[in-house]
Curated annotation (Swiss-Prot):
UniProt protein name: RNA 2',3'-cyclic phosphodiesterase
Single GO term (MF): protein kinase A regulatory subunit binding
Motif HXTX 2 in this chain: 125-128
Organism, as annotated: Thermotoga maritima (strain ATCC 43589 / DSM 3109 / JCM 10099 / NBRC 100826 / MSB8)
Active site: residue positions: 40 (proton donor), 125 (proton acceptor)
Function: Hydrolyzes RNA 2',3'-cyclic phosphodiester to an RNA 2'-phosphomonoester.
Amino acid sequence: MRTFIAIDVNEEVKKQASEIIEKLMKRGFGATWVSEENMHLTLFFLGEVDEQKISEIAEHLCRRVRGFPSFSFTVKGFGYFKRKMSPRVFWLGVENTDRLMKLYEELRNELSHHGFSFEEKFVPHITIGRVKYYPDKWEKLIEDIDFPPIEVAVDRFKIYSSTLTPTGPIYKVLYECQFEGGLIRYA
């Protein structure tokens, strides 16, 4: 099954993100927009992993971060990744904190023991849309879009499965790892 590890964002972030999506749609942008219930900060995309292995990975990851201190990060700003001269992905910025990087590094180190490698630099962000089409002079149309700073408290991460459908992905929580509470299985 397709799997990824993520941190959920709060309702305030989801509401503000939906308002930005609405603006972009009204301005002529077409995208596969991320629904509020699917908004998250991806830590790792693991790809296809069988159920037995993901269970083992979840246990090891959770053990690795048991007692990790709770922390927060700030979602702030709006941006995009480009392909050539075209917008490819719209995102909300995440201010990188030492604790977020430490969590990422702990999980990455544990995942490396399970055969995963991640060469790309970690650029924390929250994807809100994968752009399909855009209007002429699109850069001018997004100059005024911004995202006010919103703090997100973190005391856990989740492991999700992702099923691709023609109407967009369906995410299902498989495991939740609470820093102080241990592993919860949903599968």
